[in-house]
Amino acid sequence: MARRLFTSESVTEGHPDKIADQISDAVLDAIFEKDPLARVACETLVTTGLVLVAGEITTDCYVDIPRVARETIREIGYTRAKYGFDCDTCAVITSIDEQSSDIAQGVDRALEVRERYGNEDELEATGAGDQGMMFGYATTETPELMPLPISLAHRLARRLAEVRKSRLLPYLRPDGKTQVTVEYENGRPVRVDTIVISTQHHPRVTLDEIRSGVLEHVVKPVVPPEFLDGSTRFFVNPTGRFVIGGPQGDTGLTGRKIIVDTYGGMARHGGGSFSGKDPTKVDRSASYAARYVAKNIVAAGLAEKCEFQVAYAIGVAHPVSMMVDTFGTGRVDEQTLVKLVKEHFDLRPAAIIKELDLRRPIYRQVSVYGHFGRNDLDLPWERTDKAEALRRGAGL
């Protein structure tokens, strides 16, 4: 029997990098509420007493970015100076330019239109906002077709926030991290080997109180008991103290949790982050589309695991390459799957935006606890509406 361990991590909404992601996506949502055609690339830095929002934004609407930043920080829970960060007293600095005209011309009129070898329809006219490769992944390990380690890590992180905000564990503060190690046997998850939870807390609570509270009210409600046994290891605040947290403890930046945002390291990653980017940026939109493709292939029963790669050239509408890897679990060959993808999915940027209805203020909600496998949200890239057509196309 082949056994191996695989580990994934998540972070809470109060983690400094996630504060930055949430502010960037809150700004994007605020702009999209007024101008769905805006071009947005919004980056955020948070540190002790300071928020810096910078980027390239092209829009005719006005958004009060400092107000958006403060409200986001307030909702996360940094509402008092003794937490090390305060939504009302921190400084908020903005530095915003318009999108580069050199980039804009390639997005506004794709190479296919400029050189007149493409159609003059609206879906052909929009070029990719950058070069790069994006990956999507799906697996039968969980009902949401996500890897079990990242699924459990996200659920533990979300539960930490829930018990803090409901005051079930009133001594918790916003910053926190989770990590789950799952043991696999012949490619199937069989048990949880290790759980690590680090959570910011009130200075006068004891470590024993934190450990017992977290195990009882965070771990037990989240991790299925059949995955726990007498050998499962639990590490709760293993440094012994986590009072200084959030931006006071670490500087946070947009886009530094790309593995947390996706598949917990189980799949490859093209390197591009999501938050603060409008959907003409294929780092975001094509990653969502790639998940849509991979999930439908797995939902169709064509493979137990599927990784899909798509790649683009800046200013060009059509992808330059596509690749499917089923890791030996496919019921049809991978070349056939690529052919089926080309038949059933239009992966030009404008087509992705239209198919997934991405010019809406839907991004703040996915800026924490993962962009994929979110059964708590109605996300278009999580639909499996093309599974039956793929199954028929494969002759199954």
Curated annotation (Swiss-Prot):
Its EC number is 2.5.1.6. CDD domains: S-AdoMet_synt. GO terms for molecular function: ATP binding; magnesium ion binding; methionine adenosyltransferase activity. Residues 99-109 are annotated as: Flexible loop. Catalyzes the formation of S-adenosylmethionine (AdoMet) from methionine and ATP. The overall synthetic reaction is composed of two sequential steps, AdoMet formation and the subsequent tripolyphosphate hydrolysis which occurs prior to release of AdoMet from the enzyme. Homotetramer; dimer of dimers. This is S-adenosylmethionine synthase. It comes from Pelotomaculum thermopropionicum (strain DSM 13744 / JCM 10971 / SI).
